[in-house]
Amino acid sequence: MQNQLIRLTYASTATFKTDIKGGIESEVARILLQSRRNNSRIAVGGVLHYGDGYFFQCLEGDESAVKSTLQRISQDQRHRDVQILLNVQIQRRLFEDWSMKYST
């Protein structure tokens, strides 16, 4: 039996400096690469937005997988002040085909 599907959105403050070697884009690219690898393995999908020093992300999937993903994000040194904005049960996913889409 499959656990309940959920959609969870959060916002967090990025901790990396704007003058890092390779620029912000390289740091976000590393986050995306890691997210896509992890998420496809556990069937979590969603979209990530980064702008003005903040992340906004929507995650969808099995409740336990999404909550495990959020726990990893909360412990990631690149995020600070993780605030859950929405946590709802869903019948169907909007981002089923995306392990992690990026929006600027």
Model-predicted segments: where are they?
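Charge-rich, low-complexity N-terminal segments
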Residues: M1-T104
